[in-house]
Amino acid sequence: GILSKSGPDAKKMFTDKVVPISVNYPFFFKPIQDGMDRPKTELAYRVPASKFTRKKLDTNEKLQEITGLDTTIDWKNTGDNSYDGEKLKLLVHDESGKWERPTNILNNWRVTKTCLRLGSKIIGKCMMGSTSNALDKGGENFKKLYYDSDATKRNANGQTRSGLYSLFIPMEWNYEGYIDSFGFPVFETPKKPAEGPDGSPIRQGVIEYWTNEVEGLKG
């Protein structure tokens, strides 16, 4: 399942990211798929339905046994009760730090958390990534969810208060333009230019770059 800060954002992630990956799978990796090759709402990895014809019934023709994954990838509109009553193997929560009123990420997580469980058994996982809005525009709820996900603070069942584990990745670890050809971040300004993935020189470190940005904003 896919959720984002708005329905159109979830749809865009599905159509622009998920579907092209499926389309470009090598044929020997691609599961059997039902429906269109570029769907707008759901990727259905199941065996397409076949019609029962009079000829098949009269001749008692045996249907070819083909197995599929019997699973789907879809997206939902943003709302507190999105995916209510469903069971999921994976939920991708995109831009979860930017849910503005009247939607509330805390309310939605109380619902979707149950989609990943059967009683006490965990049957699915959630990947919830985001930068954060201002506190009064969804950031406060996301902040609470983040601090409720401290892996060092667990209840008697071994789970955090939220059921998630928090992971903070600082901006400088993955800032475009400051990653060298080996995939490592260039923190400090190098003595001689490093080389980026595209062969372009990196003459400045990301920390110095952002220090200059901050200084430029001072009145």
Where are these regions (language model features)?
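Conserved Walker A/P-loop ATP-binding site and its immediately adjacent core
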Residues: 1-21
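Extracytoplasmic/secreted cell-surface and envelope-processing proteins
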Residues: 12, 100-101
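Amphipathic alpha-helical
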Residues: 16-28, 219
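Conserved RecA-like helicase motor-core motifs
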Residues: 26-36
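Conserved P-loop NTPase catalytic core
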Residues: 36-41, 49-54, 59-64, 68-81, ...
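Walker B catalytic acidic pair
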Residues: 94-98
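Short, conserved "post-DEAD/DEAH" coupling segment immediately C-terminal to helicase motif II
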Residues: 102-122
